[in-house]
Amino acid sequence: MAHRITDECTYCAACEPECPVSAISAGDSIYVIDENVCVDCIGYHDEPACVAVCPVDCIIKV
């Protein structure tokens, strides 16, 4: 499964550097997760790193 960033994203950029597979990039108004690249941090972290650092909890499981 992958994750998705919702429209509640504040464009703070906290998530982007945390992704171990570089699945997160800046979109026009919110950050975007490439669902074909996202591995839910399996093999890297105990929980998805982006979810752990998001200050507004706008990253959801797809």
Curated annotation (Swiss-Prot):
All copies of domain 4Fe-4S ferredoxin-type, residue ranges: 2-28, 29-62
Binding residue positions for [4Fe-4S] cluster 1: 9, 12, 15, 54
Annotated binding of [4Fe-4S] cluster 2, by residue: 19, 38, 41, 50
Pfam families, per the entry: Fer4
Cofactor(s) required for function per UniProt: [4Fe-4S] cluster
Record-linked SUPFAM superfamilies: 4Fe-4S ferredoxins (SSF54862)
InterPro entries noted in UniProt: 4Fe4S_Fe-S-bd, 4Fe4S_Fe_S_CS
Keyword Transferase applies: no
Gene Ontology molecular function terms on file: 4 iron, 4 sulfur cluster binding; metal ion binding
Alphabetical UniProt keywords: 4Fe-4S, Electron transport, Iron, Iron-sulfur, Metal-binding, Repeat, Transport
Gene3D superfamilies named in the record: 3.30.70.20
Comment on bound cofactor: Binds 2 [4Fe-4S] clusters.
Role noted for this protein: Ferredoxins are iron-sulfur proteins that transfer electrons in a wide variety of metabolic reactions.
Protein name (database record): Ferredoxin-2
